[in-house]
Amino acid sequence: AAERNITIVPEIDVPGHSAAAIVSYPELKLSARPLPEIPVSFNDGAAFDPTSERTYQFIGDVMTELASLFPGGIIHIGGDEVRYKKYWEGVPHIEAFMKKKGIKTFPDLGRLDGKAIIHFWYGSDKIATKAIEDGHQVVNSTSHMTYINKDEQKLPLSKSYSFEPVFPGLKPRYHDQVLGLGCQVWTEWI
């Protein structure tokens, strides 16, 4: 990969998309919630307990191991598609944790560090352009062009190959902040 200027970026999507980990390590789940089944769909409806030190120890251990396996220096942590209302809203110890940390609403959890690289996969190009203008670097993986597990009739491979990751209308001075593109594949759909 390095010879072809490709950085392989592993993704461990947390705190959502965590059913397999929670089934394997039940101590990571919210105590009041039943164990999820291991699904074969994009949205598993499970989330770690954000108040548990065991959660952070587990995630830290996984990230440390990934960092030793992938030399690119970047790990994608996802952070999307968490069903906050279903799993965290109304849970007293989570609400107490949020209050203690000064987190007023669940969307406040989505604030980004200024150094965060944004992996743009869905929504208006204006969102990504604004993030770039605010100083973020972006990987453009807009789903209608880069999700290579889609039916060949809907997204021919030739269309993915021809995709230009620089957003239309992005001022040239920002082009270097577009790091490239990512192509996604979900093997359960192949």
Model-based region annotation:
Residues 1-105:
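Substrate-binding cleft of carbohydrate-active enzyme catalytic domains
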Residues 52-76, 81, 99-190:
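Substrate-binding groove of N-acetylhexosamine-processing glycoside hydrolases
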